[in-house]
């Protein structure tokens, strides 16, 4: 499932993050690449664990913790600290798949990358190109979202970023280990939760159907969760 999550950051929060990022020193994006990705990747990136990356990343993690749609769709167990990249002057990222396990340098913290996330930090009209293209059995899905919006998709997907030919595309990217490993199971739970929320709004939380469906949701989560 590929999902657009609007308004993860407010415009004010985006501006605060950009103030941090625009004052930072950027390095070659291949610092975090695997062997396959290094052959396809050309961009700039904030050094992992740098003060700027930590400050902006903390703001994003705080926002994610308050976002009900993110929790419903991802069922997060672990979130890799957000990283940041910048594409300009023809930079692009060819077709690749993300590494299955992400290690936080200098620690024993590791994340199984069930889901990948890109949080856009530049308005789409300010640059040409830079579309995130995610492939699945139904074709290629493209994302170029307003600043503050995020796209969530299975980390097992082939994906690429088209060349940026004008302006600069600035974004955060990170990975999530879900409590529910299987994408189909996780999608089913998300769809069920969405309908429970809709039914609750119509009938109230004490309705017998709402109570029954909520029980089914939690029993499925109990069956499938790794937590």
From Swiss-Prot:
Keyword Repressor (UniProt): no
InterPro entries, sorted: Oxoglu/Fe-dep_dioxygenase_dom, PKHD_C, PKHD_hydroxylase, Pro_4_hyd_alph, Pro_4_hyd_alph_FE2OG_OXY
Domain named Fe2OG dioxygenase: residues: 78-178
Signal peptide boundaries: none
Residues noted as binding Fe cation in the record, renumbered to the chain: 96, 98, 159
Enzyme class: oxidoreductase
Highest taxon, organism lineage: Bacteria
One GO biological process term: DNA damage response
Cofactor: Fe(2+); L-ascorbate
Protein EC: 1.14.11.-
Residues at which 2-oxoglutarate binds: 169
MF-aspect GO terms: 2-oxoglutarate-dependent dioxygenase activity; iron ion binding; L-ascorbic acid binding
Keywords: Dioxygenase, Iron, Metal-binding, Oxidoreductase, Vitamin C
Cofactor comment text: Binds 1 Fe(2+) ion per subunit.
The name this protein goes by in its record: PKHD-type hydroxylase BURPS668_A1690
